[in-house]
């Protein structure tokens, strides 16, 4: 075969024959390639058709199996659905019961909260009233404490005046040369509260333990009234001052006064000396009238026990009456 495109070439018969040969070879190879492609396409189509038929058969088998199984399990499915319905109904009933219980508990909680609110208000009112009562009682206690302090100072002053009057009576009687009025120390001595701390005694320890506060902000104050009722006050109050320092002299002053005073205080003259004898006159041992405090004297080994007398003598109509007591008391 010759192509019409090569009709224009007139170089020579060799070139034309070579071109024709090349074209024929190319055409032959193209035909072979096309035939190969056609065969491959046919084989591919054949394989696809066989695969489609296999899948169709498998699908048919699965459909048959599903139909058979569904027909067999129809009865079991109805029983299971009924059981599930019953179970659901039971759970719903339990849920309703729990909801009712929850509602009841909420109501009870509201009631409890209301009661708590009422009780809190009541407690606040009572606490306010109680605090007001405590303030009033604390004020009253403060007034009583100040009155007690005034009375203690008055007692100390009256005691000093009483002993001054007694010294004047003793000096005017002239019954003895060793009268204590002759001593300038006794004449100028007046009871005064001690500047230093008094020695610790069981009585002071008991007072301190009773007046000690149980809390830094509150202290317990027990007071018994005329009706023997115990009142408990819990409010910061000042402790009642101890009147003992106003009634007792210091130990250092006692030691100093012992050196200045005579060891024997003679009895005071009385109009009734002829009627009865005083134990102080009958016994020549060392006797001492306490001036609101204790003064201890050194006694000889053979001396009899001292007679302790009351701290304050009674002056009635210019006569001195001395009272004896078994114990030493302070005014």
Curated annotation (Swiss-Prot):
Record PTM Phosphoserine, positions in chain: 209
Biased composition range(s): Basic and acidic residues: 193-203
Presence of the UniProt keyword Disulfide bond in the record: no
InterPro entries: CCDC74A/CCDC74B/CCDC92, CCDC92/74_N
Coiled-coil segments on the chain, per record: 18-44, 76-152
GO cellular component, one term: centrosome
PTM comment: Phosphorylated at Ser-209 by TTBK2.
Cell compartment(s), UniProt: Cytoplasm, Cytoskeleton, Microtubule organizing center, Centrosome, Centriole; Cytoplasm
Keyword terms, alphabetized: Antiviral protein, Coiled coil, Cytoplasm, Cytoskeleton, Host-virus interaction, Immunity, Innate immunity, Phosphoprotein
Region (Disordered): 171-212
Main location (coarse class): cytoplasm
Pfam family, one: CCDC92
Record keyword Lyase present: no
Annotated Low complexity bias: 171-184
Inducers of expression: Up to threefold after interferon treatment.
GO molecular function, one term: identical protein binding
GO biological process terms, semicolon-separated: innate immune response; regulation of defense response to virus
Subunit annotation: Interacts with CEP164. (Microbial infection) Interacts with ebolavirus protein NP; this interaction sequesters NP in the cytoplasm.
PANTHER family recorded: COILED-COIL DOMAIN-CONTAINING 74A, COILED-COIL DOMAIN-CONTAINING PROTEIN 92
Function: Interferon-stimulated protein that plays a role in innate immunity. Strongly inhibits ebolavirus transcription and replication. Forms a complex with viral RNA-bound nucleocapsid NP and thereby prevents the transport of NP to the cell surface.
Name of this protein: Coiled-coil domain-containing protein 92
Annotated source species: Homo sapiens (Human)
Lineage: Eukaryota, Metazoa, Chordata, Craniata, Vertebrata
